[in-house]
Amino acid sequence: DIVALSVATRPDCVDDNVLKLLEKLNKIKPVWVELGLQTIKESSVDYIRRGYENSVYVDTATKLRNIGIEVITHIILGLPNESKLDMLRSVDFACKYSDGIKLQLLHILKGTDLLKDYEDSKFNALTMEQYINILCDAVSIIPKNVIIHRLTGDGDKKILVAPLWSGNKKVVL
């Protein structure tokens, strides 16, 4: 038996028709929607080509929660040129509109534009110590009513360039 439905999407892909469908499904089985916010820092939003304003996330998350659907927000820690404070601001912002949060380390993968900037020394990947430090501070500001669904992830080892330590997430956990 299906116990619940979890949908991961972009906030700009949730139009009124999708909302109606999700609301209908939520009456049959619980529905969770994971929204990819990644960051709220505008220069980072442009850099990663997210493609929508923070207000689109807020609008979609609010509409989903208003119809009884739990929202889980995805945040990437370690984006180029983001300070620890920038990352914590994104976490804090996401928690205002979420029932859950997924925290993900930035992975630099082969065949990406990000790799070129990394190889050109435009930014450094986080060390494990930096990531754990940021993660601990992030966890400390997440309200008790917001479920932490992920503390880290592991990139595909065949294409992972950096940080290589992230290939073994058990070490991080």
Please place each PLM-identified region on the residue numbering.
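Conserved strand-turn element in the central/C-terminal portion of the radical SAM core barrel
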Residues: 12, 42, 64-86, 105-108, ...
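Alpha-helix-loop-beta-strand connector modules within alpha/beta enzyme cores
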Residues: 2, 54-73, 123-145
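Conserved SAM/AdoMet-binding glycine-rich loop
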Residues: 1-54, 59, 66
